């Protein structure tokens, strides 16, 4: 690995939004390599405290004086152009680089970059593959969009030429990367605040495919129609996977009492080996097939692939068991797209329970508006739906869409759905209405997980 694009290790690099999951990982990689690092964020968090302990200078709040000694400033797409630190950097002619550009340049220092893309499943698949790579002793550097117990966080710095990272399509960020193995898990309509439509999204993934060198690999879910329409763009080696078709397939699928799949891995109608998952749902069978394909393409041993897959029990906020209270189970999941919600509820339906309460917090006004019809059809596996207000994230409420409007449509469809504006009210409703053996599933990419924690910690 090398950091040629930075040139001088004595340079001071400042991260605006350093508390973010990806930005903090980049900062930690540089701290490990003895760079001088500072960063700012709006709030203190366990992530910023961890970086401080590792030697970073952390500022709470964005102020122009925070960047006075910086030689290079890295910022996220969420940072506004009138941010005082950005403004000061331009005044002082300090070099600015967005997160995706910085990560792409970092990837140039590695030979075997594995970039995992797709609308859904990136964090889980990256985490699952990380288990496989660690079992195979390839000593990878890992950058994942969640907290993974085996690496005690969201980043691991290795000494080899293997670099494993998520590749997000938002604002075409992944087109700044340099994949040797590029993975496409699925393509779905999302981020329609940036992309015009599904065809625009497919065009971005088509460009991603073209980034892979001829001696590299495209690993793709061959049963996804949107992927099928662009896979011909590949000039590299192609490995497809699926349940009923593809180079690598899952046969003889059985689910255990917690909805975790067991299956045979088949190539050319010949069984390679069997695996038993410890994460639930059909979607995780597909995620595991992607990880298996990458392992095979990287010449990892079958036993290491099996042990890696079977040692994976999930990441935080992905069908995470939060605890039990009075024999009522609480699980949290990051799902925030209708397809993800359907998959999560399908897995939850197979999980032992009497009544399934789905507590959902829509994530961003733009997504709720553009995918509204899909949101009205993805909760059918829930016995009861509880809706919190929309989590704004980077957006402002224009009054065009609301969680109440979604609730009205769900009730029109005959589903039992209740809207609340405060987490305390949701908690109290659950206390009054849940019974022995019920399952509470909190769903969303915002802070809805707090409801489950409030319930458990009564």
UniProtKB/Swiss-Prot annotation:
GO terms for cellular component: cytoplasm. ATP binds at residues 118-124. It is found in: Cytoplasm. This is UDP-N-acetylmuramate--L-alanine ligase. The keyword Cytoplasm applies. It is an enzyme of class 6 (ligase). It catalyses: UDP-N-acetyl-alpha-D-muramate + L-alanine + ATP = UDP-N-acetyl-alpha-D-muramoyl-L-alanine + ADP + phosphate + H(+). Pfam families: Mur_ligase (PF01225), Mur_ligase_C (PF02875), Mur_ligase_M (PF08245). Keywords: ATP-binding, Cell cycle, Cell division, Cell shape, Cell wall biogenesis/degradation, Cytoplasm, Ligase, Nucleotide-binding, Peptidoglycan synthesis. Its EC number is 6.3.2.8.
